[in-house]
């Protein structure tokens, strides 16, 4: 294709609203354009990239045995009310009414719709297992859409849903989809990691997330350097520390005027933060609960929700703290609270000896408290965020490291979460009704495009992996409008490369060479070939791989061999 025949509206300046590199470069390169907050138009160049992602995803879904269908984006409210998610999903669910005053929503996901389809159409165990998928537009009414395609309100997603007679059948499909996802992201040329994950609002049992590794990623990815353990921060655990063994000191209440934070407490008392048991007051499903952590640890609200079996866990407000304990925040502790409040401690907090904690009165703290002697041990659970250097929970030798990642895929074992609430039953081999078990599997197709840019760029622009590039080869024809020889040679090379199976963009624009080179670098085509009177006079082509800054002169045989070699690298 000729550059003069395709619309590529590049920008010299970075738009002010673009924060992430992917947002900046996709706008500057003419791949997308903003319509409204969180809404983007895919321009011709961007759509070529998007279609490449879709093609790879579709091929691997078909290879795994999943069957493609297409469901409505507008969904009736009664399905969501039936599953219990109409209220649970919150304001991110865009709700609307039709002219008959019936309630609907724009689908952020399709568990309810596919469940309704299954209960209408699947009646016998002979029809199972079955796995359906679609590639379709979704909508989530994000409160603050930002980062371009990374967190928009409208996005394109591949979502798949499988139905089974039992868990062993689900496990087989789950593994097949897990492996299909690995193939998808490998084929797309992305560096990624699959990690154990929490199921969140989707519900269900086992799940894994797939993260593209990038410094700009919103998510913390925890992994062991010695074994294959990996999890996201919400799920990650560490091997418990051994309890401290010290001679108990005399407990004492001391004045700590105005000392509210752990750091202030440690400095005032002359102790490390690890010698403090801090109290975090939360409201779990409307009930006040006291959570205890070691002073140098951070509360993981997702873990707390699971430990408390609560759907909603919020930090207590100052007035709630005083009402429940008689003390302001910063001075609350587990010893003799004003009211009988449920207490749950993190495992590490129960391993601290001679610790300091709030005394449930303003400007007072305890020091040298010890479990069992001064106060009873409360129930314990894993409540903390792991930290780099923690011991791996799966092996004896490993320690944990933390990297940043961008979530681009998620696979869930839903179990009976939706089949029970929506009554999906089939006749089993004995002729009795049996509840099916489900899995669901998502890939953020449009998000993959942005994530790829976050991983593949330099100060000149995007560096697309071959599998994602809108064109694989860019030919820069210098002064083609003035030199018939350059125009003819560039066109002949274009035709030869396309005959070899490459997708080629021939830059035949009447622009200065510097502008042509800058455009090629910005849009990130993997291979650049320069055709000019100078190189033609030498009987060679000037070649550069986008990932390098090295220009090399090659004859046609060498050029074809170099392209094949570089192309194979991705």
UniProtKB/Swiss-Prot annotation:
GO-annotated cellular components: cytosol
Gene3D superfamilies: Anticodon-binding domain, Bira Bifunctional Protein, Domain 2, YbaK/aminoacyl-tRNA synthetase-associated domain
Superkingdom to which the source organism belongs: Bacteria
InterPro entries xref list: aa-tRNA-synt_IIb, aa-tRNA-synth_II, aa-tRNA-synth_II/BPL/LPL, Anticodon-bd, Anticodon-bd_dom_sf, Pro-tRNA-ligase_IIa, Pro-tRNA-synth_IIa_bac-type, Pro-tRNA-Synthase_IIa_type1
Signal peptide residues on this chain, from the entry's feature table: none
Keywords, in A-Z order: Aminoacyl-tRNA synthetase, ATP-binding, Cytoplasm, Ligase, Nucleotide-binding, Protein biosynthesis
Gene Ontology terms: biological process: prolyl-tRNA aminoacylation
Cellular localization per UniProt: Cytoplasm
EC numbers, comma separated: 6.1.1.15
Catalytic activity annotation: tRNA(Pro) + L-proline + ATP = L-prolyl-tRNA(Pro) + AMP + diphosphate
MF (Gene Ontology): aminoacyl-tRNA deacylase activity; ATP binding; proline-tRNA ligase activity
SUPFAM superfamilies: Class II aaRS ABD-related, Class II aaRS and biotin synthetases, YbaK/ProRS associated domain
Annotated CDD domains: ProRS-INS, ProRS_anticodon_short, ProRS_core_prok
One Pfam family named in its UniProt record: HGTP_anticodon
Record function comment: Catalyzes the attachment of proline to tRNA(Pro) in a two-step reaction: proline is first activated by ATP to form Pro-AMP and then transferred to the acceptor end of tRNA(Pro). As ProRS can inadvertently accommodate and process non-cognate amino acids such as alanine and cysteine, to avoid such errors it has two additional distinct editing activities against alanine. One activity is designated as 'pretransfer' editing and involves the tRNA(Pro)-independent hydrolysis of activated Ala-AMP.
Domain text: Consists of three domains: the N-terminal catalytic domain, the editing domain and the C-terminal anticodon-binding domain.
Complex and partners: Homodimer.
Similarity annotation: Belongs to the class-II aminoacyl-tRNA synthetase family. ProS type 1 subfamily.
Protein name: Proline--tRNA ligase
Organism name: Acidithiobacillus ferrooxidans (strain ATCC 23270 / DSM 14882 / CIP 104768 / NCIMB 8455) (Ferrobacillus ferrooxidans (strain ATCC 23270))
Gene for this chain: proS
